Design a protein with these regions (language model features):
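Glycine/serine-rich phosphate-binding loop and adjoining beta1-alpha1 elements at the start
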Residues: 2-32, 42, 76-80, 86-209
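Glycine-rich phosphate/diphosphate-binding loop of Rossmann-like nucleotide-binding domains
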Residues: 54, 192, 199-261
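Histidine-anchored nucleotide/phosphate-binding helix
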Residues: 54-67
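Short internal beta-strands
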Residues: 70-79, 235-237
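An anion/phosphate-binding loop that grips the pyrophosphate of nucleotide cofactors and donors
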Residues: 264
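Rossmann-fold NAD(P) dinucleotide-binding segment
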Residues: 275-289
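Conserved small/polar residues in nucleotide/adenosyl-binding loops
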Residues: 291-298
Length: 299
């Protein structure tokens, strides 16, 4: 019986080429891979990873496999899955992958449960869906879990709420708190990729537009920097007074979203939270304006 669920196995060769291309830009992970081949630190450990199924994640999975881990990968977001990468991991590395680009909600949670069926010792989450499903619906599998990791702000918020309630049954490392994560991935990676997504989706000229950034955490800082670099007039909205002051000192206009709503041409929120843009904000916007939510939850 095939222990995977992907779109098309014939896409594997193209996926392998793209995975190797991404590896060129990942020298630290490559050096860890080489060390893991010799040390095998995860021998006998089962890992269930719920992450974006991309070329970068593929290199992480093969590195964990090289370290002896028995890994299963499922998608943390159906919209980001790269089907050729999923096929390559299955066909060339024999890593079970359950991920199809554009999968519906039922399939998404079927795949989440496939990750739990693996009886993981360690969970790797991006959005905390495996951990939350374990605690809500599959508690009989908690006994095998010794710990986990959570990559993104949205997931960390969920898990900290569980921990505060005494509901979190095992320790989870908040990867997002690592300086190498938020200083670089959040600020530079998310800043660039968000701008790339906005331009691809809208084909807008950014120069001269009033660009409203909701929040001033590390992701928002990166986007504000990129938008200004492309000639936008950037407004920042931020409820934390210290971060708001920092945005002012960085040279941005700072105001409430109520004040910014009628001024903006493009709105992008990067807070990992709800109600940054609400009905009354949309009602105050220009007749033609563009909104973009940059957060884990897209379903």
């Amino acid at each position: 019986m095939e222990n995977f669920d992907i779109k098309d196995k014939s896409l594997a060769e193209g996926g392998r080429r793209r995975i190797k291309w991404a590896e060129r830009e990942m020298p630290v992970l490559r050096s860890i891979h080489e060390r893991f081949v010799k040390e095998r630190p995860f021998e006998g450990i089962r890992m269930s990873a719920c992450l974006h199924v991309t070329t970068e994640t593929a290199n992480l999975m093969t590195t964990l496999q090289a370290g002896g881990a028995d890994v299963v990968l499922v998608a943390s977001n159906p919209l980001s899955t790269q089907d050729d990468v999923a096929a390559s991991l299955v066909m060339h590395n024999e890593i079970p992958v359950h991920a199809i680009k554009g999968e519906d909600n039922a399939t998404y949670y079927k795949h989440i449960n496939s990750a739990i069926d693996h009886k993981p010792h360690i969970t790797m989450d991006d959005g905390a869906d495996v951990v939350s499903t374990l605690h809500k619906d599959r508690r009989d599998f908690l006994k095998d879990v010794i710990g986990g990791t959570e990559e993104t702000t949205t997931g960390v918020i969920r898990l900290r709420a569980m921990a505060a309630d005494g509901a979190l049954a095992f320790p989870v490392v908040a990867v997002n708190d690592a300086m190498t994560k938020h200083f670089f991935d959040n600020r530079y990676g998310t800043g660039q990729s968000t701008m790339d997504g906005i331009i691809r989706a809208t084909n807008l000229l950014i120069a001269g537009k009033t660009f409203v950034v909701g929040g001033y955490g590390w992701c928002a800082r990166g986007l504000a920097m990129r938008a200004r670099g492309m000639g936008a007039n950037v407004i920042v909205t931020e409820i934390d007074p210290l971060k708001a002051l920092e945005a002012v000192m960085d040279g941005f206009r700072v105001m409430t979203m109520v004040e910014a709503a009628p001024l903006g041409d493009i709105f992008c929120t990067l807070t990992g939270d709800l109600h940054v843009l609400d009905k009354h904000h949309f009602e105050a916007m220009k007749a033609v304006s563009y909104t973009h939510l940059r957060a884990h939850e897209t379903r």
